[in-house]
Amino acid sequence: MNNILNRIYNGYNLTEIESYNLFQYIMSGKINNVQLSAILIALKIKGESEQEIMGAMQACLEQAQPFPKQNYMFSDIVGTGGDLSNSINISTASALVGATCGLKIIKHCNSSISGKSGSYDLLKEFDININISQKKSQEMLNKLNVCFLFAPQYHASFKHVSLVRKILKTRTLFNILGPLLNPSNPPLSVIGVYSTKLMIPIAHILKKLNRHRSIIVYSNNIDEVTLHSPTNITELKNSKITSYTLYPESFGVHFHDKNTILGGTPKENYEIVKKVFQGKGPISITETIAANTAILLQLFGNEDLKKNTQYALKIIYSGKVYQKIIELSKF
């Protein structure tokens, strides 16, 4: 173990097996908090390699509680966070719209670590309880097309790293791992990342996991599709990886200034998202959520992004998403 630690401290990449062994130690609580802080910051400064991400992911998944296998296509839509953008919870909002469109969504959720508002924090403001049993989550999925898997419930070993992550208050390898650790092993996924450097490595990892189709997104330091800048896309489809760029006009919507999608605390984000789903929200945020939902719809074979966006907008303005939120809060 000392040899592995010295390699990290000296700026060398670990092999997949070295990373796996290291994170087995970490997730078993065998590394003290001072060492863990040094490891995470050293990896961050060096830049986490594909092999390091893969090894760490395998170690974390081995200790996770799996979610029952589904016999149909379903998706996650999730971001690494850590992009420092303070945008509203776009992925969570888009998951709710997608489910209202009839898609099956199993979203991996957590409270905020390196930002102001995580998916759990927003859902809590809507009185949606996601800290529920597997059976209850499955019932929610069956009845309402969506369920939310609360990360601490399925990844108990993360208790060994939570304090350090909160103290560091910066993105680390665990931000990268989050979207890869959904206990349901979704065949489809939209994954937002905070850096273009992560796009190809994550696509390679998803390919090794035999994912059916995945779309990885990045836009001007934000881990979502945005309408103020081009959005970089890396797509895994039929075991082939391609990269391309999308623009606001790709979705048939308007350009919007970055400052118009800013959020804040969970309470502030709740007020914004509530207005959107009541049909009274800012057009910039409404169209941004619709564009992200369009990507989600594309995963399920609906290839026309402009039609997808218009359909998502229709669903939002119908009030059906807000009605689904009310149903979820009663579950």
Swiss-Prot record:
Q: Note whether Magnesium occurs among the keywords.
A: yes
Catalytic reaction annotation: N-(5-phospho-beta-D-ribosyl)anthranilate + diphosphate = 5-phospho-alpha-D-ribose 1-diphosphate + anthranilate
> Which amino acids does the record list as binding Mg(2+) 1?
91, 224
Looking at the record's lineage, which domain of life comes first? Bacteria
User: Any idea which UniProt keywords this protein has?
Assistant: Amino-acid biosynthesis, Aromatic amino acid biosynthesis, Glycosyltransferase, Magnesium, Metal-binding, Transferase, Tryptophan biosynthesis
The record's cofactor note says: Binds 2 magnesium ions per monomer.
PANTHER family in the record, alphabetically? ANTHRANILATE PHOSPHORIBOSYLTRANSFERASE (PTHR43285:SF2)
What's this chain's function?
Catalyzes the transfer of the phosphoribosyl group of 5-phosphorylribose-1-pyrophosphate (PRPP) to anthranilate to yield N-(5'-phosphoribosyl)-anthranilate (PRA).
Q: Know the name of this protein?
A: Anthranilate phosphoribosyltransferase
Q: Please tell me the species this chain comes from.
A: Buchnera aphidicola subsp. Melaphis rhois
Gene symbol? trpD
